[in-house]
């Protein structure tokens, strides 16, 4: 299979919708429980971006540099919980700022810094909330894309369309809110049961 064929397969509507739903369900209902894995995936992507930057600007052997930096990023984020907490909080705060005040970009950065800091101190409640919101958003986006036929390239061209899609009408609002609430309750109940079993 050629790289172009593989890229077309991975970005096909069925693959994208399936990925969004599966990742959304995992994050929504067991996001806190698998936080190390989730954090390692974030590190992998950040390491990959660093590797691409190094390759473009300084180095010739692209595959080795990108692979090495992705592995280092994944290991760092898996071993140092604070890195995942900071990045998760910052990303959440940034998108909240973009959604609430799209005209004032500076507030998105302020909220990103604020949520990154807060997530370090109230790790469990905020991480449960954030993973539930991200998971519910992924599922609601997948449902909207499936119904309307919107393709992932349309979303990538203008990320603000994500919010328009998720909150496009009362039904999507209800779906999103129900998933967030169910995700939070499920994660807390699971965590509580595990703590009781340990005692």
From Swiss-Prot:
<dbReference type="GO" id="GO:0005886">
    <property type="term" value="C:plasma membrane"/>
</dbReference>
<keyword id="KW-0472">Membrane</keyword>
<feature type="transmembrane region" description="Helical">
    <location>
        <begin position="37"/>
        <end position="59"/>
    </location>
</feature>
<dbReference type="Pfam" id="PF13886">
    <property type="entry name" value="TM7S3_TM198"/>
</dbReference>
<feature type="transmembrane region" description="Helical">
    <location>
        <begin position="10"/>
        <end position="32"/>
    </location>
</feature>
<protein>
    <recommendedName>
        <fullName>Uncharacterized protein AF_1434</fullName>
    </recommendedName>
</protein>
<feature type="transmembrane region" description="Helical">
    <location>
        <begin position="63"/>
        <end position="80"/>
    </location>
</feature>
<keyword id="KW-1003">Cell membrane</keyword>
<feature type="transmembrane region" description="Helical">
    <location>
        <begin position="126"/>
        <end position="148"/>
    </location>
</feature>
<feature type="transmembrane region" description="Helical">
    <location>
        <begin position="163"/>
        <end position="185"/>
    </location>
</feature>
<dbReference type="InterPro" id="IPR025256">
    <property type="entry name" value="TM7S3/TM198-like_dom"/>
</dbReference>
<keyword id="KW-0812">Transmembrane</keyword>
<feature type="transmembrane region" description="Helical">
    <location>
        <begin position="104"/>
        <end position="121"/>
    </location>
</feature>
<keyword id="KW-1133">Transmembrane helix</keyword>
<feature type="transmembrane region" description="Helical">
    <location>
        <begin position="83"/>
        <end position="100"/>
    </location>
</feature>
